[in-house]
Every structure is written in C-alpha cells, then in structure tokens.
Amino acid sequence: MTAPTRTTAPTGVAVEVTDLGVTLGGARILTGVSLSVRTGEWVTVIGPNGAGKSTLLRAVGGLLPGSTGSVSLFGTPIARLRRRDRARTVATVPQSPVVPAGMAVLDYVLLGRTPYVPPLGRESAADLAAAYDVLDRLDLTGFAARPLATLSGGERQRVFLARALAQGAPLLLLDEPTSALDIGHQQEVLELVDQLRADHGLTVLATMHDLSVAGEYADRMVLVAAGAVVADGPPREVLTDELLGTHYRARVRVIEGEHGPLVVPVRARRPAS
C-alpha cells in the first residue's frame, strides 16, 4: 500500500521551547519551561495530574498564541508559520478531539489530508490511498464507513491517531495516546509510531501516564511538576524511586526491564493487628 505523503524533516532540532510561560483563566499553568527535541527523537513528558503536560503540548502545536517565551519547529518560530504550513509540519492527537456529528471514520481520517488539498479542491487518489494505508495499519479498515459515534473508546482512539498519521507531518504530538486502549492495541499503536520513526525520521513528543510503557519507548523523558521542568534525561535517570516519590507522592519500586525501567506500585505496609 502507499504510505502517507510525508513532509521531509530537516536534520537537527525539531522542537525548541525557550522560557515558555502560559496563563489560563488567571492561573499560571507553565513557568519558564525550556526543552529541545532532536529530529527523529521520541521525548515523553510525564508528571502528576495538573502539572501542565497537555498545556505544554498545546503550546508546541501553536494552539496557545497568548503564551510567553518562544516555540520553534525545525528552526522556524511557530508564530511565523501559516496555518497550512503548520499543519504540514505538526500533527496532534489531543486527549478529547472534537468530532463533527455523524462523521464516518474514513471522512474523519481524510481530514488529515486537508493541508494537501487545494482550495475548492477534493481529495486525490493519493490522499485516499494514504487514509486507507493508516486504517489498515491500525486494524481499522472494516470501520471505514462506520460513524465514529458508534465505535468504542479504544476504537475511536485509534481513529484519532489514524487522522494524525495520515497528515504525514514530520512532528507528531501525542497527548495520552493509549489511555483508552487495551494492552494489545497499546503495543500495536506504539510499535507503529516507533516504526515510522525508524522509516521516516518521525519526531515524537508525547505525554503518558503509564510510566513503564513511557520508559520503554522514549529516548528521553521530561518530568514536569507544578508547571516547571524538574528533570530531563534518559528514562533511567528520570524514572527513579526518589523523583517519583517526591513529585507523584507515590510508593514505587523501579526495576530494570528489557527496553527500559519498569515502575511497580508498592502498597503501604499496614501494622500487624
């Protein structure tokens, strides 16, 4: 099958965030956040609920124009990218996408091809081939004509990813991409994204709550707490008993896995009765 048309990613730094600050509804969400992501790298942002992870991804995707500091994608400040150019550069899978009522799966996935459709034009045969390719890769071909509203949560999650992959952008932002998936489809989705990294140099910036899964796929992890970066490095340096205990207020034991550290919750000991 024909793979989705992909914009060629320059080498070097894909994402450069400098001194980013975000205030929403009068509340300071992010303060002085700086990070960089190399082209072809997989960086996963972790942190407790309310830390600002999703807000960071929205800012990187250009969805928070009122933020302070700067965000550049492949060397270009995001504020200078026209909407169509931005859509060809970065694809986003948000936690709760807005889905038009009654829209079928194939039509939704084809929305990812919008940046390549000329004004007043229609999707080409190549666009349809790209959409069917990702549907096939995500085991969704049989759902192409189904309304999205009739699918389970996990099936919809895969459709949301399919739309983003059909976009063919060199940068993929994933906000909790496996939250509604069973373990089999989690592995299927993440292995597909990782294969696209290997084959096409795709750059991935994700947020994830499952720390063990995050540690197996990420090249680097960024721990955010109270709106600030408190740790940045390889999974083995960030997923430690001390850091997780401090910022998650959780009892855990970190053990070595085949592809990265695994985080195991530890129950509190109760005094003998």
Label every PLM stretch briefly:
Residues 125-143:
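Conserved ABC ATPase "signature" region
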Residues 69-77, 86:
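Conserved ABC transporter NBD signature motif
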Residues 61:
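Helix-to-loop junction immediately C-terminal to a conserved catalytic motif
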Residues 46-48:
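The feature captures the beta-strand-to-loop junction immediately N-terminal to the Walker
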Residues 147-151, 155:
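Conserved ABC ATPase signature
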Residues 245-273:
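ABC ATPase nucleotide-binding domains
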Residues 172-176:
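Catalytic Walker B motif of ABC-type/P-loop ATPase nucleotide-binding domains
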